[in-house]
A protein has these predicted regions:
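Active-site nucleophile and cofactor-binding loops and adjacent substrate-binding regions
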Residues: 2-7, 52-55
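Active-site-surrounding "flap" and adjacent substrate/cofactor-binding loops of secreted or lumenal enzymes
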Residues: 21-46, 243
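Active-site core of glycosidic bond-cleaving carbohydrate-active enzymes
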Residues: 4-10, 60, 73-253
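The substrate-binding groove and active-site-proximal loops of carbohydrate-active enzymes
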Residues: 49-53, 124-126
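Conserved kinase catalytic-core segment
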Residues: 13
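A contiguous strand-loop segment
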Residues: 34, 45-47, 57-71, 82, ...
């Protein structure tokens, strides 16, 4: 009855694929049927109605992961068509990625493009979800023989580097003029309070969120030792928040 995909693509969908493959195939077919009915995969569906809650393009990592683990019984080419539509359609006609235009043109989503009210701006969170989705799409494209797409989407997926600020040592929102937000406190957003750039979390809850390029992120931070030291500091200072999804994988990094 609910495809709360922002919540579930990170770990629950993999568990479902491993333990309940037949039911997972049924759910994926339902998702593809939703696309056939109205042109978009579900994002955060509730009782057969799309709510557009949260951000990203979560059907991509959800279904791509299942396919790469060997699940069949659904039309992967139809799913790929849906994924490519949301990853390439211009923003004014894109229900899944309404702020895709600067994401493609600049490699990131600036503050204020999607939400004029800075307290409700989730630009960094939006872009991070797009990077991960595009990486999953790149892997699927390669598996299906779409080599040019695989290269394109992998290049996009590395755009997270735009957000890394050496000054703060975290990912940091970027303003419309291409500068890092200032003043900036990476602890803003703790305990689900509003913070410019981040949805339901602080910069510390999102800074390590490049699971598709962990070694690349470590290089940005000055190497694997500094990466690990910074991660340890997050735990030591109580900046880790397992109550929400973006940083739940931190213990496994």
């Amino acid at each position: 009855t609910v495809f709360s995909l922002w919540d579930t693509y990170r770990n629950l969908s993999q568990l479902e694929t491993l333990l309940y493959p037949d039911k997972q195939v049924d759910m994926i077919n339902s998702m593809i049927d939703m696309y056939r009915e109205w042109g978009w995969m579900p994002k955060w569906e509730l009782f057969s109605r799309e709510t557009w809650t949260m951000e990203g393009d979560p059907a991509i990592p959800y279904i791509a992961d299942a396919y790469m683990r060997g699940l069949r019984g659904f039309d992967i080419n139809e799913a790929y068509k849906a994924f490519r539509t949301s990853a390439t359609t211009e923003g004014k006609n894109n229900r899944m990625r309404p702020d895709i235009d600067p994401y493609i043109e600049r490699g990131y989503v600036p503050m204020g493009y999607y939400a004029a009210d800075m307290s409700g701006d989730n630009s960094v969170s939006h872009a991070l979800e797009y990077y991960l989705a595009d990486n999953a799409l790149s892997i699927l494209a390669g598996e299906l023989g779409h080599k040019a797409d695989a290269k394109l989407f992998r290049q996009r997926a590395l755009g997270y580097k735009h957000y890394y600020s050496k000054e703060s040592g975290t990912l940091r929102p970027i303003t419309m003029d291409g500068k890092f937000l200032s003043p900036f406190n990476p602890e803003d957003g703790y305990d689900f309070t509003n913070a410019p750039g981040f949805h339901e979390g602080s910069a510390w809850n999102y800074t390590f969120y490049a699971p598709h390029d962990v070694l690349g992120m470590a290089k940005l931070m000055g190497g694997q030792r500094k990466f690990c030291d910074k991660l340890q500091m997050v735990f030591d200072k109580g900046l880790y928040d397992p109550a929400n999804e973006p940083d739940i994988a931190y213990p496994y990094l």
